[in-house]
Amino acid sequence: MLRKQTKKILVVMLFALTLVLAGRVDANAQTAAPAGVKQVKAGSSSVTVQWNAVMQNDICYYYRVSDDAGFKSNTTRSKRNYNASESYISGLSAGKSYYVQIGTSTTKSSSAPDDTAWSKAIEVVTVPEQVVSNSVKQTGAGTTSISLSWQAASGANCYKLTCYQSGT
């Protein structure tokens, strides 16, 4: 009878120890990098990016943006963003490509700490400047066509022209 009780006590103790060890968190463990980073909005001087939230307590998100994919240029910036899965990034130039990474850390700091786990870089693009309408000039005309010129908009790779026939 004593052996059965001892076995039961040992089984309960092993079970309790297993639960304690399973719930133990390594305070020095690095957080996971966010996935699913994508651009969702663009303005002439800003972009908005979203990502899948990392399921961990006390996460602090950071972003960094650069005009080169290796983040070696002097334009690299980082900014703290607590408990959010979207960030508005401003202060960019119109019609230009940038690279953005989202990072996570449990360290709360004004800039990204050394233990930040960074996502893969994505390319984001700001909206090009608009063509100033008074810069559009007719440079030629034929019986069925016209030629136009205008001052190029910074960062534009195509233009949409809308023509109206006047007097009808």
Q: Where do the language-model regions lie?
A:
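Short S/T/G- and acidic-enriched coil/turn segments that sit immediately N-terminal to beta-strands
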Residues: 82-87
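An aromatic-rich alpha-helical recognition segment common to small helix-rich domains
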Residues: 34, 51, 63-65, 89, ...
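Pro/Thr/Ser/Gly-rich low-complexity, intrinsically disordered linker/stalk tracts
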Residues: 28-57, 94, 111-155
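N-terminal secretory signal peptides that target proteins for export/translocation
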Residues: 1-5
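Short, tandemly repeated low-complexity microdomains enriched for cysteine and small residues
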Residues: 74-78, 114-115
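Beta-strand-rich modules
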Residues: 89-110
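Bacterial N-terminal signal peptides
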Residues: 12-22
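Extracellular low-complexity, O-glycosylation-prone stalks/linkers
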Residues: 55-76, 153-168
